[in-house]
Design a protein with these regions (language model features):
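Ligand-binding pockets and gating/stacking loops
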Residues: 1-175
Length: 175
């Protein structure tokens, strides 16, 4: 847990430097262990969040502050998400299990006004209360931030399935 969590800040610093140097797209994958089932292979919630939650918060906050200070807030789009959420209730081992009903998503920059909460869950966090955002909406958001979708439709040589999928994906509605 600890060694994996210590690398994110360095990776985000490298990503910012690559963007400043003109790189148009940087992908970071972490080896963070968000599985906090509280079983023989995984930490429980309290230990797990101490091991990865705090370092994640620190690294991402420092990255955002660094980008803002350098005037890169509109030029860099940070997206942080996982493939699933966690159960609304803590299990008998003090952990949480996989949950497909809701997934956290953090978006920063790219001209999107910060401080927004988009969507709402039920009080117990088990399912969406408002219209859910899905992977297609996320892809639509990324493509709308990166490309002029109208121009993309008329480009020669692009796979028609990709263009059709991207142009039909509704971006997440931010204020």
């Amino acid at each position: 847990y600890q060694n994996n969590a210590q690398t994110l800040g360095k990776l985000l610093l490298l990503a910012r430097r690559l963007c400043e140097a003109g790189c148009g797209f940087v992908t970071i994958t972490t080896r963070f262990v968000w599985d906090m089932h509280g079983d023989q292979n995984n930490l429980g919630m309290q230990q797990g969040m101490a091991a990865v939650g705090r370092p994640f918060d620190h690294a991402v906050s420092a990255f955002i502050e660094d980008c803002q200070a350098r005037g890169l807030g509109d030029d860099i789009l940070l997206v942080s998400t996982g493939e699933m959420g966690r159960t609304p209730r803590i299990n008998k081992n003090g952990g949480r299990d996989h949950w497909g009903g809701l997934t956290p998503l953090l978006v920063y920059g790219g001209g999107i006004r910060g401080g927004q909460v988009v969507g709402q869950s039920t009080r117990d966090g088990s399912k969406p209360l408002t219209a859910p955002c899905n992977s297609r909406n996320l892809l639509g958001t990324l493509m709308a931030q990166l490309f002029d979708i109208g121009e993309l439709r008329i480009k020669q040589g692009l796979p028609t399935d990709l263009v059709r999928y991207v142009s039909s994906a509704t971006p997440i509605q931010f204020d």
